[in-house]
């Protein structure tokens, strides 16, 4: 795990340390925010009540959160709860989308170029979440639990009230629901795990963190 963490830190330093690369990534993020928000979720947003909007554009919103979080981190203005929120969103919705397209392809038997583009872009979204997850820093258990609670509430809104993302004829609401439940549970457990809280606190305070 120590070697993996060193790789993650190296990638983070490379991206944030080179302005051209950093801002290119942020522009790509914002293109995803606009395209996904308008093309994929636009019709649903128009037909939904305003209170539900924060729960609807899952991946575009995650990309927006990531962009803001990365900019704050690069300019030494981190907001730990927001970094955790963005990391959770990117990992949850990135992995959910990868599962979504994998299930669709297995059932449909065909793969379209646009679908491949979406799959690859959500690998990137997931990776952004991993990078942000290593930069949470000083964040108490209550704030962590609230972040996990929000994404648990989003499951209720999506699948209990019918505001879940558009699905294909292959991907059923049951599959989508249980994928969301599993991802939220695993990420929530990770975020609130005492050993993770202690390790991230120690790093933020500049203390030595043992790595294998």
Listing of model-derived features with the role each one plays in the protein:
Residues 3-26:
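N-terminal membrane topogenic signal
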Residues 12-16, 72-85, 134-142:
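Membrane-interface helix-boundary motifs at transmembrane edges
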Residues 32-81:
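Selected alpha-helical membrane-embedding segments in polytopic membrane proteins
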Residues 36-45, 98-109, 158-168:
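Juxtamembrane "helix-exit" motif on the non-cytosolic side of transmembrane helices
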Residues 47-54, 108-120, 169-177:
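Non-cytosolic membrane-interface motifs at loop->transmembrane helix junctions
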Residues 60-72, 123-134, 179-197:
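Hydrophobic cores of alpha-helical transmembrane segments in multi-pass inner/ER membrane proteins
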Residues 86-153:
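Membrane-proximal helix-loop-helix units in multi-pass membrane proteins
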Residues 135-212:
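Terminal transmembrane helical module of multi-pass membrane proteins
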């Amino acid at each position: 795990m120590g070697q993996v963490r060193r790789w993650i830190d190296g990638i983070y330093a490379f991206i944030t340390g080179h302005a051209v690369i950093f801002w290119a990534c942020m522009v790509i993020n914002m293109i995803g925010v606009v395209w996904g928000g308008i093309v994929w979720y636009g019709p649903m947003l128009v037909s939904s009540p305003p209170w539900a909007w924060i729960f609807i554009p899952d991946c575009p919103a995650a990309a927006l959160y990531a962009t803001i979080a990365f900019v704050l981190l690069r300019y030494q203005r981190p907001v730990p709860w927001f970094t955790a929120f963005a990391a959770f969103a990117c990992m949850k919705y990135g992995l959910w989308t990868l599962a979504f397209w994998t299930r669709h392809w297995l059932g449909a038997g065909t793969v379209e170029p646009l679908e491949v583009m979406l799959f690859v872009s959500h690998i990137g979204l997931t990776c952004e979440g991993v990078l942000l997850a290593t930069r949470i820093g000083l964040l108490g258990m209550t704030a962590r639990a609230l972040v996990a609670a929000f994404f648990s509430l989003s499951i209720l809104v999506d699948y209990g009230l019918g505001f879940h993302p558009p699905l294909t004829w292959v991907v059923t609401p049951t599959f989508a629901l249980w994928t969301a439940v599993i991802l939220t549970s695993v990420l929530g457990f990770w975020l609130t795990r005492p050993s993770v809280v202690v390790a991230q606190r120690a790093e933020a305070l500049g203390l030595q963190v043992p790595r294998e």
